[in-house]
Amino acid sequence: MKNIASFANKKVLVLGLAKSGESAARLLDKLGAIVTVNDGKPFEENPAAQSLLEEGIKVVTGGHPLELLDENFELMVKNPGIPYNNAMVIRALEKKIPVITEVELAYLISEAPIIGITGSNGKTTTTTMIAQVLTAGGQNGLLSGNIGFPASQVAQSACGKDTLVMELSSFQLMGIEAFHPQIAVITNLMPTHLDYHGSFEEYAAAKWNIQKNMTADDYLVLNFNQDWAKGMASQTQATVVPFSTTEKVDGAYLDGDVLTFRGEAIIKVAEIGVPGSHNVENALATIAVAKLRGIDNQTIKEVLSAFGGVKHRLQYVGQVNEVAFYNDSKSTNILATQKALSGFDNSKVILIAGGLDRGNEFDELVPDLKGLKKMVILGQSAPRVKRAADQAGVSYLDATDVRDAAHKAFALAEPGDIVLLSPANASWDMYSNFEVRGDEFLVAFEELKG
C-alpha cells in the first residue's frame, strides 16, 4: 500500500457505515489513524457498528450529533449515500475538514492502476466484462467499487501487476480530489438520481468528475451515440476513445453486425453471450478498454461470447414449461427498460414494471411498449405506468409485489413466451434495494418450477 504514513495518528471521522464505511474504518484503523465511526442506525440494530466496537474502534450511533465535530477531526470519509446537504457534512466543510468518499481513500493507498467505469446504465455489466477480459489476458482485473466489493478493501491487497476495475456511482465521484484512473469509461447518461443531485446538470457534473485529474496519457472512453458525450469530448485533458453503434468512429463501433475496433473485426452481435442493444454498447466499451490495454482479439471474443451476464442485469434465469424468465431488476429508469426490450420480440414478452414514484411520466417508453403481449404493473408508480400502457395499447394486470407479479405473468404465458422483470423504476417503495427485488423474482421462479 502507498501513503501509509500519511494516515498515522490522523483523526478521521467515518460518516455512515454500510459496506464501504465499514471497509474504510477498518483500513484507516490498520493504517494507524484515530478513527471514529458515526452511523444513524441504533447500536442494537447495527451489527457493523457492534463489530467495529469489538475491534476497538470508537462508534457513535443512533443519529448524527453536530457536537461530534468539535473533536478536531482532520478528515471525513463519507458514505456515498449520505448527501452533501446533510448537516454533518455541511458543518464539516464549514470547519474546513476535507470530505472524501471511500473510493478516494482506495486510490490514495492503491499500488495498482485503476480503470473507472461510470454511467446511468450498463456500469456493472461493463465493469464485469472488462475485469473478465483483462484477467483472461493475463492482467488480473479486480472488481471493486459500487459493484459490491468495497474499493478500499480490494485496494489493500492489490499490487502493481493487478488492475482495479472500479464501478463508480455519481455519489462516489462527487467526493474525489486526487482520484486518477488511467482509463475511464462513461457508458451513457440520462436523468436519474435527481432526488439526490437536484438537477441533471449537477448529476452530469458528478459523473464528469471521473476525468477530473486525467492527462493526455490517459484514456476516456465515451459513448458517441449520445450528443452529450460528443459535446464534452473537447472538455477533457484525457485522450478520448469513442464507441458507437450508429457511426464509424476512431475507436469501437458496429460495422453491420460486427463489433469492430479501428478496422479490426472482433465479434458478431449474435455471438455475444447476452442479448440486447445495450449489451452491444457494453461490449463495445469493453473492446475499447481491452484494446487500449493490449488484449488480443481472440481473447476478447472468447470472453464476450462466453459472458453470461450479471445477476439482476437482464439475467437469464431459466425456463418453466418453455417460458423463459429474465431478471432485469437493475433497470431502475426508462432507458434501461428500453434497452432490455430492444433485445426481444415484444409479441412474446410479458413485462413486469413499476416501483418507486419519482414523479416521472413514461411517455418516452410508450413506443417501446407497443406490441407487448401483456404487462403486469405494481408499485407506487403504477398509475403513471398504466397511462403509458394505455397509450401503447397494451392490456395489463395489477400485482401486489414482485412474487405476485411473476406468478400472474406466468399464468398469462404460453410456450415460447418471455417473462421479463424490467421495472423502469427504483425499488424503494417496496424493497430495500433492487437486489432484494430481483431475489424475490428468483424465488418466484423456483416456486413455479416446483
From Swiss-Prot:
Biological process, per Gene Ontology: cell division; cell wall organization; peptidoglycan biosynthetic process; regulation of cell shape
Enzyme Commission code: 6.3.2.9
Subcellular compartments: Cytoplasm
Keywords: ATP-binding, Cell cycle, Cell division, Cell shape, Cell wall biogenesis/degradation, Cytoplasm, Ligase, Nucleotide-binding, Peptidoglycan synthesis
Record has Oxidoreductase as a keyword: no
Record's catalysed reaction(s): UDP-N-acetyl-alpha-D-muramoyl-L-alanine + D-glutamate + ATP = UDP-N-acetyl-alpha-D-muramoyl-L-alanyl-D-glutamate + ADP + phosphate + H(+)
Top-level lineage group: Bacteria
Homology family: Belongs to the MurCDEF family.
Protein name: UDP-N-acetylmuramoylalanine--D-glutamate ligase
